[in-house]
Amino acid sequence: MAIPASRLVNITPRVISSGSTELELAGVLLTKNAIMPYPLLMGFTGQQAVGEYFGYDSDEYRLAVIYFLGFTNSSKKPNTLYFFRRADKAIAGALIGSQALGVTDLQKITEGGFIISVDGSPVTVTNLNLSTAKTQSDIAGLIQAKVTGTTVTFNTNQKNYRIVSNTTGNDSSVTYATNGTNVEALGTDVATALGLTAAAGAVVSQGTAAMTPTQTMNAAIKQSENWVSFTTVYQASTAEALELAAWSNSNLNKFLYCAYSMDAGQVAGGDSSLPGQLAFNDYEGTINTYDNGEVSVFVMSCAASIDWNREQGAISWAFKTQSGLAPTCTDDQTQASLLDNKVNFYGRYASRSEQFNIFYDGAMSGGSYGFVDVYINMIWLQNVMQTACLNGMQQTQRLPYVDRGYTMIKAWLTDPINRALTNGVIDPGVKLSEAQKAQLYQEAGEDISTELYTNGFVIRVTDPAPEVRATRGTPNISVWYTYGGSVNKIEFPLTAVV
């Protein structure tokens, strides 16, 4: 027996975290496909998984192939592609089963039963006899005969049963199956054998009334905001595209809507065309492409392929390529019209000896950022700064309204800024116009142009008003940074001196 050493030296273990998980610049595809459960934001980590779920002949798979390829010579590839149900019409509630046992095993069910609820009313299934079934469709028909008010089908891709209510709207529903009778020959119960229980991995898809594009996007971000770009699997109408653009604009530099169309108005322009309306409303957060969806998804893929931890990892979208992606613009007049309308495209250019298929030119449809790389860089930097400040506030005992506290804030912001200097989001040495210098002087109350030119960034943290301090509001914090953009065109005279 001895006196514990902790009476003299007591060490409390602690950890200073390296930080939180960063925002993933993943993409979301809105789909009307009936096999997509609502309101699940379903993520896939590869094109094969998309093909296995939606089918290899589906548009979802076709677009996923493009998304996961990234751009040629990218140092990383996209990690995740999400899908979300676009319910432009009222949809039915459904139970989407997990993979069920095969027909031979299910034939051993002769007096099966379980309880399931349809549209709020419980249905008790008894005497379910599958012994005569020859196919999965036979089994689906036998289940449907017992579960009144539903349609039951078997999905050959997912190898599961789907029980769908015959009603639609907010009150339409099908619950998980419970209380399955045990089948000794299978070593499990009926509901589990059919893949209809929560424990087995079944998914409940809620019924809903028809939703507007705005309601759809708000439902999606309730599931997760760990994504940035989005577009539609189907061709959105001009009205729907404009509403999606308005939603992106209303969310303050958080999302990028990748609109697309092959409509003649993309080339001709005009007040009623999609580019005309996008320009008129000056929406922030939308890029428009001339294509059938594939180039739009390529835009999303480029964002998801950026390696923010790599030296000069930030990219320009112009001149990016992907093997197998078909050009959507092949003549000079069309490309000139598209560029005038701020419509992007995948173009075929040619010199006398070579042809080049490239994306061009990365312009945003409206707003103040000009090009998509500027916008995406801001989304990334905004998020890492927010995360750095939150991590810092969690790890410090308190943050006083004095120089010591303000120095801590500057330190928290310095780590993201150093990363931005490394990956190319921030470029020192950018020459400012006199108008820009004047605006900076007005905002900062001093001439910061030399510091900004030299360092690429300026941080200022100052005291707030006493009444702000009394309510524990924010200090006055401003961060300015410069970005050198990217050259989209080279022109010069070639002079022979003879």
Predicted regions and their residues:
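Extended basic-aromatic, gly/pro-enriched interface segments that bind polyanionic ligands
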Residues: I3-I11, T156, Q277-T414, R419
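General structural signal for secondary-structure boundaries
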Residues: G46, E111, M211-P213, A236-S237, ...
